[in-house]
Swiss-Prot record:
GO terms for molecular function: ATP binding; hydroxyethylthiazole kinase activity; magnesium ion binding. It is an enzyme of class 2 (transferase). Keywords: ATP-binding, Kinase, Magnesium, Metal-binding, Nucleotide-binding, Thiamine biosynthesis, Transferase. It catalyses: 5-(2-hydroxyethyl)-4-methylthiazole + ATP = 4-methyl-5-(2-phosphooxyethyl)-thiazole + ADP + H(+). This is Hydroxyethylthiazole kinase. The gene is thiM. Its cofactor is Mg(2+). Belongs to the Thz kinase family.
């Protein structure tokens, strides 16, 4: 349902993301059926966000200048009622990253918070090991998701060996995916963009259902890619993953 709607809408998804993953993110969105724009010029965004379906803010390659860009872009998105997805990359790795992430969450309207266990744990004051975008082990992703949902009053997606989605106090746990996905730089960052495209093309009447389908589409694409690339390595997996995203249909996830 939501995947077909995305393909029909072809949502313009503005991605202010990190320098490492821009190409992969754009190609992933195109494969899925969305329309990416990677603009980082405020004068440009003033017009783009009047017609955009969603905005992704990914703080991976953070600078003081980019912090100001995030703030200005979110202000424009909020003014135009464009949903904003925040990916607080490595929020627990430094005080500066934590400060920026909390500023964006507390002072602007965020539509979805997406991160790994360590990142989201840091935002809610839980003591967890963090080693950048890869994060550390978090024992209970479900409780972290619920706490973040309550603290920030925003839908939350927490990724790990089990993914947790929390919306208005309701939680859903998902276990699809491939162990090869974390071995390709940008798979987590692309996920943030994919979630933005999904909610940006929906009517927002049931975020839990929409996010569940988005996560399942993404993770099942990883499973398909793993089978295709078996024995070939992570380079082949990356290509197979984009192929799987481009060929994904709703009936392929019906029993997942």
């Amino acid at each position: 349902m939501y995947l077909e709607q995305l393909k029909e809408v072809n949502p313009l998804t503005i991605c202010i993301t990190n320098n490492v993953v821009k190409n992969f993110t754009a190609n992933g969105l195109l494969a899925l059926g969305a329309s990416p724009a990677m603009s980082e010029c405020i004068e440009d965004l003033e017009d783009l966000l009047k017609v955009a379906n969603a905005l992704l803010i990914n703080i991976g390659t953070l600078t003081k200048e980019s912090w100001q860009l995030y703030q200005e872009a979110i202000k424009i998105a909020n003014k135009n009622q464009v949903p904003v997805v925040l990916d607080p990359v490595a929020a627990g790795a430094s005080r500066f990253r934590l400060e920026v992430s909390l500023d964006l969450l507390k002072n602007y309207s965020i539509s979805l918070l997406r991160g790994n266990g360590s990142e989201i744990a840091a935002l809610v004051g839980e003591k967890q090991a963090s080693k950048g975008a890869d994060g550390g082990k978090v024992a209970d992703l479900e409780s972290i998701a619920v706490k973040a949902n309550q603290v920030f009053d925003v839908p939350v997606v927490v990724t790990g060996e089990t993914d947790a989605i929390a919306v208005r106090g309701e939680v859903r746990l998902l276990q699809n995916g491939s162990p090869l996905m974390p071995l390709v730089t940008g798979t987590g960052c692309l996920l943030g963009a994919v979630l933005a495209a999904f909610i940006g093309s929906s009517d927002r009447s049931d975020d839990l259902a929409c996010l569940t389908e988005a996560m399942t589409v993404y993770n099942v694409s990883g499973e398909i890619a793993e089978k295709v690339a078996k024995g070939k390595g992570v380079g082949s997996f990356q290509v197979a993953f984009l192929d799987a995203l481009s060929q994904m249909k709703s009936e392929m996830i019906m029993d997942k």
